Amino acid sequence: MRVVLLASAVLCLLAGQVLSICSPVDYTLYVEKPECDFCVAINTTICMGFCYSLDPNVVGPAVKRLVVQRGCTYQAVEYRTAELPGCPPHVDPRFSYPVALHCTCRACDPARDECTHRASADGDRCSKPLLLHMHAYPGQSNYIQTL
């Protein structure tokens, strides 16, 4: 009986690793600068998905070793640059944004990651007219950063 229980527990832990679905997904950023005339919709990818976590509801110093809290975060990122239209000559119209290339499940590191619990609901709104068709900045410099 104990062997069956132990085997079931091991299989559940392994299934949690296999079912950790963390991958790049399509996302639309709405970007505007106060000095420019338009809001721009930029299509990119972000890391999103499920990562295995374990947080036992038992209190004690030995339990801290059992806590596994990982989130879906960037493993490799490429930064791209877009040019925002309708900006006066004294304003830099360029905007750089991340594109997720590969994602991974790991504990959040505040020195490297943006560790937020909930995104703002206002992030998907524009206060200026929206332009839906955006072209990359002609002289854009893409660079890849592996985290």
Swiss-Prot record:
Disulfide bonds join C22-C72, C36-C87, C39-C126, C47-C103, C51-C105, C108-C115. One of its GO terms (molecular function) is hormone activity. Glycans are attached at N43. Heterodimer of a common alpha chain and a unique beta chain which confers biological specificity to thyrotropin, lutropin, follitropin and gonadotropin. GO terms for cellular component: cytoplasm; extracellular space. This is Thyrotropin subunit beta. GO terms for biological process: G protein-coupled receptor signaling pathway. The keyword Cytoplasm does not apply.
